Amino acid sequence: MSSFDIFSPTASVSGKFFLEASAGTGKTFTIEQVVLRSLLEGSIEQTKNILVVTFTNAATNELKLRIQASLKQALSLFSQALSHPGTPLPPYISSSETKVKQLYMKIRNSLATLDEMNIFTIHGFCRFTLEQHFPWIQPIQPSSIFSEPQTIQQHILDYLRKNLWDTVLSPKQYAFLSYHHRATTQQTRHLIERLLQDYTSTPNLALSPLSITLQKLKAWVSRYQHLAPLSLEEMQAFSLRFKQSDLSIERELPAFVQQFETNPYSLDMLFFPGMVQKFQEENRNKKKLSAPASPLDPFFQDWIQLAHPFCQKEPIFHTLLKSVQQHLKTHCAQSYSHDESIATLESLLAHNDTVVSQLRKQFQLVLIDEFQDTDKRQWQIFSKLFASPDYSGSLFLIGDPKQSIYEWRNADLPTYLQAKHSFPKEAQLILDTNYRSTPELMQALNHLFSLPTPFLETPQNILYHPLHSKGSAEISYSEFSPIHFFSSEDIQEETLWISKTASYLRSAYSIPFGNMAVLVQDYPQALKLITHSTIPMAYCKEKRIFDRTESPYLLILLLEALLYPENQQKIQAILMSRLFQLSSTEIHQHLKTFSSLFFTLNRHLYHYSLLATFYKLMGENVLSQTIGETLLQTPLGDIIFQELEALCLYLDKTTENPHHKLLHLINILITGKYDEELSFSSQSNDENMIKITTVHSSKGLEYDVVFCSCLNKAKEKTPSVHMREMYVACTRAKKFLFIPFSPIEKRSLSTKKLSALANYANVTKHHSVPHLVETLTSSSPELFSSSFQPPESSLTPDRERLPQQTYFSLPHLPSRTIHSFSSTVENLHFSEPIQELSPSLLFPGGSLTGTLIHKLLESLAGNFAACFEEIFNKAQTLLKNTPLEGYESIIAEKICTVFSTTLPFSSGSFALRNVHPHNIRAEETFLLQEEGELWQGIVDLFFEHKDRFFIIDWKTSFLGDETSCYSPDQLHLYIQRQGLDRQERLYRKAAKRFLHQFNSLLQVEMAFVFIRGLDDKGNGFLQPGR
């Protein structure tokens, strides 16, 4: 393969090329420069004649920004060349004044029309082509009632409700599958949810038809029918020849014996999961190998071949999924998933030369990025369009087989290699200069990946091509070589080593924690590292809103109902969604009520934000509970709630016009283009935080220091996948690469699960990982080093020892006093000891009484409709063995009065028992800054009633014997004397600050309620400032 230099005058960007771009070789930079050079040299006329296809939506956005930046830089350069003729230009450009002016104008025009450039994912390109050239074939369009996911979900529900699965699964298989998808934990999902999420996937593991399985079963029964009736005792004795398994077979053995005797031709004969697991050949007890041969050996060996796939969860699910897909194709005419859109376009292009000719004419430059992740059908489309001799434009296929780690997304290496060898040798190019890693680290990586020969064993072997380094970083490798192996026997020791080494590198090399990464296989491994780490670490993973649930479609339905409340079809659509989950009967019975609700919400949307309207809707009661509660009780309901919040907030920021919000959201779904703001990411930009991420998520990223914990964890993968993931992990590093290994790990040919490092040792003919490490470090100590002890003890005396672990800490801020009313207000009555009973005061006073009654009121929050007996029982429980024991009856009576008495707030009078329990919050803490001072407060009661918000502060103060002692005038004097008017002002300010996050017009009222003196004459209640 020839080296490709985009700036070389002898290099060409006109023609068809296959470009291999190893990690760190500036692939994206090359793409943007190919676009720029093609524009400058005139091989393309306008930006709309450019087609770039890449892997993800995020990559399309990044590419467009990078190309835009490249064009701006070129525009600045040519502008400078016009005013300063001696300005150096790219070597492939003529420096004549006329030429420079023409190119300046072309770059300026290209920038102005950059939005016309076609940058797609493969699925986006297929949808675009189908819409433009085959308009009669469209994906499902959201109807006036259902969005696409809802339409699909309805058909899946019908499929399951009508038991259509019984043509592909046995009843026991379906029951087994349903059980494993019950939504009892965060790790399990309803079967419908998974079918809805995966209905576009390819069911590669689907089982043979039941008719074929039944034929094989009958042949097996005929072969072994002479063994009937089976002896349970012999079966139990036979089972002792095998090791203990996770699933018990105590109940299965008798059932198996009976099934074989009474109805062996039933498919139930194959469904004994515990026996399938138990009687696997690898589970044989080696101590029992000397036992005499048993006729049950061939009996069960043949049975296992039939029963094993029949009892596996994923093959059963894929079988069901395949049947559901066929059902959807029949009942959802012209419905195309991502994968189906590829297959459809491939089929249409095969028989439509006119469209092929139009596409070839439209696109003069085509760049296919991440080509190693392309599958056979995608290549059929691109080869038909642009690899053909009839295509006169330029084509670049850009990829790296060493980084093909997405086999689960149908990435197909044989297709990559087939495409590569369809190009002549002179058109097979390579980027062979690494701009990421230091020269020393690059030399070590070259050595490491040149040892396996070939690098990947495939039908056409893949070789590793060493790279030159132009990494700009300079580093002194005194303590560690560029690649350092460290020994760890468990995750705790590994984490401690990483923590200490990272701290040392930060101190000795001024490398921030934020420029370091730990690569893991999965989240459980990340969690263990975070748990044991002594320095700050964060797990970084990104999920896009549009990849997870149907929340965007739900929001479209909601916006349509909010904008058009007079349209009953749109109202019915949202009422049937998971937000409401109402049946058609319930909708018909309460349609007028719901219409009224959406007319009210329509006004709310125009006066306030979409987010505030969403929150108001979530708090509305429908039948027996709020809409928010209904949503949160559904599978993934909490995630959908968060996504709807994020979408509402994003649309509020984008435009104030409610109609534009709807159009903007629809446009996002159609084009697939959206801001990164609509991604849920835990990516941390904190320089004091080490990032933990998976190998797959790290692709395309780079860090100064990389700890490859992923290479030391055993996983059941093919040697090829292990090697590719190891390559991706190691090539993320710019300066240092650290690899943990187990000192006791040995090669085992019979072991299915290996770590990537153990696989590498196998491939390179080392008998163990320690042997591999010893070989590398002894043969090339300038490239590889190792530690077999913790860092401190492994250092020689003449070397600087690793510093003692320094724990991270936040900078010290000057201390500030936090004020509270319990600490600043002297209440003489509360400081008194327990008082004797007075004739009219039926229970003691003092601070302890206040605390106990507050606790009792807190326990009753949300239950203000409680009767006297219920309050009395609660009081007996809470006041037992306290100074108030014996006063439960009078205290319960007082509290009952508080709940039932009409409270005369300025906005309207009502009793607490009339407040909806879901609108109540008790003992809410806040921190507020007021005039340079920090105030902490605890709101006794915060609630909403009839769209108004209220605060109540309970008072148990003793002001006198009669309720007249608690008249408004007396309470005003008491409030002023105690400074409680300031408390009222601060509490209301804190509450308004909270509410204004959702609606800046919301107001709060506050009142003090004196438990001892409240009556129906207005005593015991005070609303300051009224």
Curated annotation (Swiss-Prot):
InterPro entries per record: DNA_helicase_UvrD-like_C, DNA_helicase_UvrD/REP, P-loop_NTPase, PDDEXK-like_dom_sf, RecB, Restrct_endonuc-II-like, UvrD-like_ATP-bd
Catalytic activity, as annotated: Exonucleolytic cleavage (in the presence of ATP) in either 5'- to 3'- or 3'- to 5'-direction to yield 5'-phosphooligonucleotides; Couples ATP hydrolysis with the unwinding of duplex DNA by translocating in the 3'-5' direction; ATP + H2O = ADP + phosphate + H(+)
A Gene Ontology biological process term: recombinational repair
EC number per UniProt: 3.1.11.5, 5.6.2.4
GO cellular component entries: cytosol; exodeoxyribonuclease V complex
One MF term in the entry's GO annotations: ATP binding
Cofactor note: Binds 1 Mg(2+) ion per subunit.
Active site feature: D953 (for nuclease activity)
Binding site for Mg(2+): H854, D940, D953
Coiled-coil residue spans: none
Region of interest (DNA-binding and helicase activity, interacts with RecC), ranges: 1-766
Recorded domain comment: The N-terminal DNA-binding domain is a ssDNA-dependent ATPase and has ATP-dependent 3'-5' helicase function. This domain interacts with RecC. The C-terminal domain has nuclease activity and interacts with RecD. It interacts with RecA, facilitating its loading onto ssDNA.
Function: A helicase/nuclease that prepares dsDNA breaks (DSB) for recombinational DNA repair. Binds to DSBs and unwinds DNA via a highly rapid and processive ATP-dependent bidirectional helicase activity. Unwinds dsDNA until it encounters a Chi (crossover hotspot instigator) sequence from the 3' direction. Cuts ssDNA a few nucleotides 3' to the Chi site. The properties and activities of the enzyme are changed at Chi. The Chi-altered holoenzyme produces a long 3'-ssDNA overhang and facilitates RecA-binding to the ssDNA for homologous DNA recombination and repair.
Protein name: RecBCD enzyme subunit RecB
Organism annotation: Chlamydia trachomatis serovar D (strain ATCC VR-885 / DSM 19411 / UW-3/Cx)
